[in-house]
Amino acid sequence: LKCHKLVPPVWKTCPEGKNLCYKMFMVSTSTVPVKRGCIDVCPKNSALVKYVCCSTDKCN
């Protein structure tokens, strides 16, 4: 699986076990992603951040 890093079109190949791409938003400004990459479990939302995840190449 290949996921974008913070700024597309830069991307990396995910390590084994982290088979979801994610983009993370601050809940207060949920339009601009603050972080992108590979993740193992999703969703991992909290009071401050929201994760949007997917399981296909470069979909974040």
UniProtKB/Swiss-Prot annotation:
GO terms for cellular component: extracellular region; membrane; other organism cell membrane. Expressed by the venom gland. Keywords: Cardiotoxin, Cytolysis, Disulfide bond, Membrane, Secreted, Target cell membrane, Target membrane, Toxin. GO terms for molecular function: toxin activity. It is found in: Secreted; Target cell membrane. The keyword Transmembrane does not apply. GO terms for biological process: killing of cells of another organism. Disulfide bonds join C3-C21, C14-C38, C42-C53, C54-C59. Pfam families: Toxin_cobra-type. Shows cytolytic activity on many different cells by forming pore in lipid membranes. In vivo, increases heart rate or kills the animal by cardiac arrest. In addition, it binds to heparin with high affinity, interacts with Kv channel-interacting protein 1 (KCNIP1) in a calcium-independent manner, and binds to integrin alpha-V/beta-3 (ITGAV/ITGB3) with moderate affinity. Belongs to the three-finger toxin family. Short-chain subfamily. Type IA cytotoxin sub-subfamily. Monomer in solution; Homodimer and oligomer in the presence of negatively charged lipids forming a pore with a size ranging between 20 and 30 Angstroms. This is Cytotoxin 1.
